[in-house]
């Protein structure tokens, strides 16, 4: 009898622990202008079932991109607002899903669209002004004044969109010794050496790579093993594969996310890799509004597997949940998040019928409940 009770207790404890591991905070950044959202939203999300529940909201102007620091205690947001653009810092209580505003700093550029953070710094990509700003952090997680501002000055062939530099992304290299910077306006990727304690010279340019003229480099991701990088180009649907070694990129494949018979408007947006490194996903806005699935080969190259409608308009951002079971797509123009079931064997996605109704959802971050 005692043994039976003991086994039941162990089973109950195990099931409770598994349930807790499946409970996450889903933090969503939005556009508030134009739009009908208020700022940053936190949802409870269960990775076993894809069940969700609205929890809290923190008011903020156009927090279109978010970064959670390594401790999971602080969240940083861009506030995309033209010449009035700022960067905001929040503390985060993961146990209850609550953000608390700490402070903000001028973005040192116009329309920040991406940022990354570590224990020491927050690095921001300012799109319209074509600059990079590096901010420090104090012990409370608040932002200090900018330590370094780097201005790009180039251009490219598209006279409507590439008259000047437009920094679209900053990303740490896998070893965090470099920062990769995509400049849509220059058709160029910059590779900066990163020394987080170097005062006003935290970023020092090491190399740059020219991309196909008129293609517009947007987002880049690394394979889980850090050996390959994948660049999505916004303006023509191109997708470029690189090998990566110690701050240097070498091109090994050119492909695209556009269907052969597609004749509409292209607006490549987001790119993600499954945690097992087997599949790559890329979204296209414009008149396509779809996601293309690629299988990743051992040599890093891609094979196109399938293409699916995202069931909305403007799939600016999407995310694969921590379990790998679900893929969530945010629609900027139809104001919802569509939840797909992801086949972890084939990579294919299918609609679950689940929807989060939310104005212009454009960034997603998962943080475990504590």
Spans of features found by a protein language model:
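Short loop/turn segments immediately following beta-strands, especially the blade-tip
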Residues: 43-50, 90-97, 135-144, 192-201, ...
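Blade-loop segments of beta-propeller domains
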Residues: 53-119
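Asp-box/WD-like beta-propeller blade repeats and closely related beta-sheet repeat scaffolds
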Residues: 97-169
């Amino acid at each position: 009898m005692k043994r039976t009770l003991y086994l039941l207790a162990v089973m109950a404890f195990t099931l409770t622990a598994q349930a807790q591991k499946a409970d996450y905070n889903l933090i969503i950044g939005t556009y508030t202008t134009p739009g009908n959202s208020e700022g940053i939203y936190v949802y409870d999300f269960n990775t076993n079932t894809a069940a969700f529940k609205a929890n809290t909201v923190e008011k903020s102007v156009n927090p279109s991109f978010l970064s959670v620091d390594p401790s999971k205690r602080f969240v940083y947001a861009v506030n995309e607002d033209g010449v009035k653009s700022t960067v905001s810092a929040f503390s985060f209580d993961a146990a209850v899903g609550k953000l608390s505003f700490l402070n903000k700093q001028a973005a040192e550029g116009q329309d920040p669209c991406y940022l990354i953070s570590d224990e020491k710094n927050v690095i921001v990509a300012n799109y319209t002004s074509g600059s990079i700003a590096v901010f420090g952090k104090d012990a409370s997680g608040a932002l200090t004044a900018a330590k370094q501002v780097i201005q790009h000055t180039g251009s490219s062939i598209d006279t409507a969109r590439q008259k000047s530099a437009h920094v679209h992304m900053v990303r740490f290299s896998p070893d965090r010794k470099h920062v990769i910077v995509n400049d849509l306006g220059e058709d160029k990727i910059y590779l900066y050496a990163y020394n987080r304690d170097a005062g006003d010279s935290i970023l020092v340019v090491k190399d740059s790579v020219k991309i196909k003229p008129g293609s517009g480099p947007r987002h880049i991701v690394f394979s889980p093993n850090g050996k390959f990088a994948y660049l999505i180009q916004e303006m023509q649907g191109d997708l470029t594969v690189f090998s990566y070694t110690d701050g240097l990129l070498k091109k090994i494949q050119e492909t695209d996310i556009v269907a052969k018979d597609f004749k509409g408007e292209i607006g490549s947006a987001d790119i993600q890799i499954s945690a097992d490194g087997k599949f790559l996903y890329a979204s296209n806005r414009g008149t396509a509004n779809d996601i293309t699935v690629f299988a990743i080969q051992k040599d890093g190259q891609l094979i196109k597997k399938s293409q699916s409608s995202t069931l909305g308009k403007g799939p600016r951002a999407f995310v694969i949940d921590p379990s790998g079971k679900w893929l969530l797509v945010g629609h900027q123009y139809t104001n919802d998040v569509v939840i797909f079931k992801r086949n972890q064997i084939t990579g294919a996605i299918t609609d679950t019928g689940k929807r989060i109704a939310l104005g212009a959802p454009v960034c997603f971050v998962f943080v475990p409940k504590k």
